[in-house]
Structures are given as C-alpha cells and as structure tokens.
UniProtKB/Swiss-Prot annotation:
<feature type="zinc finger region" description="C2H2-type 5">
    <location>
        <begin position="283"/>
        <end position="305"/>
    </location>
</feature>
<dbReference type="InterPro" id="IPR036236">
    <property type="entry name" value="Znf_C2H2_sf"/>
</dbReference>
<keyword id="KW-0804">Transcription</keyword>
<feature type="region of interest" description="SNAG domain">
    <location>
        <begin position="1"/>
        <end position="20"/>
    </location>
</feature>
<dbReference type="GO" id="GO:0008270">
    <property type="term" value="F:zinc ion binding"/>
</dbReference>
<protein>
    <recommendedName>
        <fullName>Zinc finger protein Gfi-1b</fullName>
    </recommendedName>
</protein>
<keyword id="KW-0863">Zinc-finger</keyword>
<dbReference type="Pfam" id="PF00096">
    <property type="entry name" value="zf-C2H2"/>
</dbReference>
<dbReference type="GO" id="GO:0001227">
    <property type="term" value="F:DNA-binding transcription repressor activity, RNA polymerase II-specific"/>
</dbReference>
<keyword id="KW-0805">Transcription regulation</keyword>
<keyword id="KW-0217">Developmental protein</keyword>
<dbReference type="GO" id="GO:0006357">
    <property type="term" value="P:regulation of transcription by RNA polymerase II"/>
</dbReference>
<keyword id="KW-0539">Nucleus</keyword>
<dbReference type="GO" id="GO:0000978">
    <property type="term" value="F:RNA polymerase II cis-regulatory region sequence-specific DNA binding"/>
</dbReference>
<keyword id="KW-0862">Zinc</keyword>
<comment type="function">
    <text>Essential transcriptional regulator necessary for development and differentiation of erythroid and megakaryocytic lineages. Alters histone methylation by recruiting histone methyltransferase to target genes promoters. Plays a role in heterochromatin formation.</text>
</comment>
<dbReference type="GO" id="GO:0006325">
    <property type="term" value="P:chromatin organization"/>
</dbReference>
Amino acid sequence: MPRSFLVKSKKAHTYHQHRFVEDDLPIFTWDPITSAFTAAGDRDKTPEDGKKQDLEWVVPKQEKDSFQPKEESVPVQYLSRMLPGPSAQDMSISGLQVKDCTNPTSMPTFYKTGFSWDAFQLPYSYRQMSSTMQSALLEHPVSLYGSHLLPSAEPPLDYSMRYSSDMETYHCVKCNKVFSTPHGLEVHVRRSHSGTRPFACEVCGKTFGHAVSLEQHTNIHSQERSFECKMCGKTFKRSSTLSTHLLIHSDTRPYPCQYCGKRFHQKSDMKKHTYIHTGEKPHKCQVCGKAFSQSSNLITHSRKHTGFKPFSCELCAKGFQRKVDLRRHRETQHSLK
C-alpha cells in the first residue's frame, strides 16, 4: 500500500480510530498545466515529501512556495470523480472554493484541509419531464371505462349527462351532480329522475333501481335479522343500520340544516329537509309529470298508476299502498295497535 494512504498517529493505530469519508478516497495530484491527475505517494519519498505532495491537488504549483492565502477552484475532473450520478458539467455546479488551506501549521493531515464542502451538499436540480418520458409513463392497460389518467376517446354514453374531459367526470344535466363513472350516473338518473325501478322483489313486490339493492333486500326474507338494539329490542339485518338507529336513543344529531339550524341523525335526512327551503323537487313521475322532493314519495305515488298494494291486512286481506294506511286500518277497523 502506498505510504500516502496511511495516516500516522502516536496514540493508536489507524484501525483503532474512526474512519472518515476522505480516508476511502484515493489521493491524486493535479498539474494545472497538463490538467491531469497522477497518483500521490511514492515509496522512495519521505513522509514530509508525501505530505507536501498530498497538498498539490489543492494548491497549484505556482503558489505553494509563496503560501499566500488565495481562493482556487477544484478541477472539474476531480469533482466528477467524487460526485455520484451526473457529471459536474451536466449539473452546472461552479468550482469548489478553497479557503485558507495553505497554512502548514493549521493542517495536521491531508484529509483535514480547509476547502469548503458546501458544494457537495447542494441538492440536485429538477427539470421538466420530457414529452417522451411522459408518454412512456402513461402507457398502461385501459380500464373498463377508459384510462384513469387520460380521457377516453370514445363518446360518453347518453344518460342525459354532460361529460368533462378535463376532470374525467360525468355531470347530470338535471341536478348537476358529479360522478366519476358513466355507470354511476346511469344509476342516479334511473333512481332520481326517470322513476324507473326495473328490479322487483318476488316475495313482497318491492322495486329497486339497482340489482345490488334488490339482492340486499332479499336477504331480509331469507335470513334472520341478527343485530338487535339492546334499548328497544328492535332487530336489524346490518350492523350499520343498527349504528344509525342507536343515534336516535343517544339523541346525537351531527348534521344541521344550513338554513334553519335543525339537526338530523343522518346526512340523507338533512339533505331531504333542505328541499323544503330550496323548493327543489328532483323526483318526477314519468306518467303524470308530478314532482316530489323525496324519492320515497315518488315510489308511493307511482303505485297509484300501477295499482300495486304491497301492504295487506292479515285479518281481512285488504291491501294498501302505504304502510301508514294499513296501520290506520288496523286501529280503526280491528282495534289493534
């Protein structure tokens, strides 16, 4: 091993001391005339000559005899060897400034020179990604409704909607609700505006606007309700419904009306209440054109046109379109509560 790679110490050997980052770097000398590096350290030279030669990469030959403090730039070739990644020319970093490194009394070893390491701590600069790189990153399989990054080239489905290519969203032209997929908008139009509920329960005849809603409803007839309220004994099919029901007993109403301040247990109830202030009636009957603020009122109204009576009295078999009418019939005609 060349002698210039070793740092002598009177207290302990080098393997007993902490190593510095500079210890692992090879020492080179730089000739400002030829702009070339040569390995420092020769077996024939004394330690004093080795120390002087170790400083030759910092102090040019013209100035090392005068020992006048002067700032000098570290050559770009050495900078490119020390910095990983892009070269110094590509990073456009100015030369390192050497400060007060020519005083031989204040310099115990070659790796404790006084030049500034600030330039090595500069972060990399960021540039705009090229169009070629952007197109390469955007290559991926197209999903069912088109890319989630790029708008679909095909025209949107006609569900009385307005399509925004900038945000990949679908707007209902009647109530301005926004949906992320055309399927979601289709279900919304069918439920809220068209009044069409093509999915009917074979047991009780209740209709739904979506197949998933019908599937969840059929579980009521086929399975036992397993979630029971311990305060009133009422049972529910889903735990989420029980959690909403418990708000009634705790009198927790986290959703206030922005117009009158009235509070509600559920956000949907608050939204239905706001239609009283705004006068909005988004649910319209397709037969007679009558509009309603709540979809449940539209469902009940549509039974007048179809003649469907899902609620029947178990004593006289008389049918009713509304549950409240059946309850009133039981109280008045059969004295039941």
